[in-house]
Amino acid sequence: MDDELTLLPREKMLSFGITSLTDAELLALFLRTGTSGKSVFVLAQELLQHFGSLHGLLNANLDEFRYVEGIGLAKYAQLKGIAELARRYHSVRVLGDNPLLSPEMTKDFLQSQLSDAEREVFMVIFLDNQHRVVKHSRMFSGTLRHVEVHPREIVREAIKVNAAAVILAHNHPSGCAEPSKADKDITERIIKCCQFMDIHVLDHFIIGRGEYVSFAEQGWI
């Protein structure tokens, strides 16, 4: 264990595996260099402390970075690149022959797609009769507090891609995932619309900042 503590992140990863790295060490591995008078590891620690977590760091916008000493456009671009790489990884992972097996797996995917959105976005995952993803789409975009959703357009797209079921999702830019009455009402409208075409609504996820609510887990669907 003493040897592990004295190793640099890259050497530690090669010796003990990538999962042995702390968040700060993993971040330092990507940033590669520090700033004048500050090592990359110290920079990584300060970034995590400033933004509270990896999630907060990777979802921060350029204006928020302007207040962090030593972070220029190059470092900002690196961090946004990491976040986008993770988002695309999750996007590719759910397509193909692997079904969405659990709410946890679905939640991880949706957080990668929606948690950094600065306005409300309504997303739909279209699935076949074996719950394999045939398509996912950001169907509607709105304001900071509201997104207008059209159930018939969801049904039309589901028929177009021959989907047997859908999973609904939208984000709350405020960070609080608690559903509003409007969220519950639109879910009911979509369910009724889909029932006419024998399309099942499996769940509706609300994605906040580091939290989520699943309508299915709550027994609302």
From Swiss-Prot:
Residues 99-221 form the MPN domain. GO terms for biological process: proteolysis. One of its GO terms (molecular function) is metallopeptidase activity. Keywords: Hydrolase, Metal-binding, Metalloprotease, Protease, Zinc. The keyword Nuclease does not apply. Zn(2+) binds at H170, H172, D183. The keyword Isomerase does not apply. Pfam families: RadC, UPF0758_N. A motif (JAMM motif) lies at residues 170-183. InterPro entries: MPN (IPR037518), RadC_JAB (IPR025657), RuvA_2-like (IPR010994), UPF0758 (IPR001405), UPF0758_CS (IPR020891), UPF0758_N (IPR046778), UPF0758_YicR (IPR022820). Belongs to the UPF0758 family. YicR subfamily. This is UPF0758 protein Ent638_0101.
